[in-house]
Amino acid sequence: KGTIGGVKIDCIAHRYKSLRPPHMESGLRLYDMEDIIAMKLAAISDDGSRLKDFIDMAFLSTRFSLDSMLRCFERKFPFSNVLGPVKGLLYFDDINFGEKVFIPAYEYSWENIALRLRDMSLQQDHVFDTAPLARHKDCREEKVPEDNDTPGQKHGRRR
């Protein structure tokens, strides 16, 4: 983990074959989105504690259907059961809600993320039109509706 030019990064060693060849950008070797999706689903299935993985999956629902995400997982990990990620996406008890989350220009609400993950499981072939996030109030591009969440709801679920 670290930053390059103010962008947070994770450096990983991965022993599975890539679904698509990595590409170079700004001198960095980057995995293809299909590989990243498969690895995120594996992390959720195996551990399920990283809040960011769940947020990333909800955000990726604007580019990929859950069905296509699961096909990436099956291709990358052919001997794994696809039910693990499906169940993992809906099991929230192990998530570390103390993890700091920074999404430029957006505020996240766990309730919106959880709702999107549930919607993804119910509409597995659907690609969603909008991200499950609200724009920061300072951003001018889009008017944000009144926000009635408490600070505790913004940074984790109610206990």
Task: Outline where the language-model segments fall.
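Compositionally biased terminal segments of proteins
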Residues: K1-R158
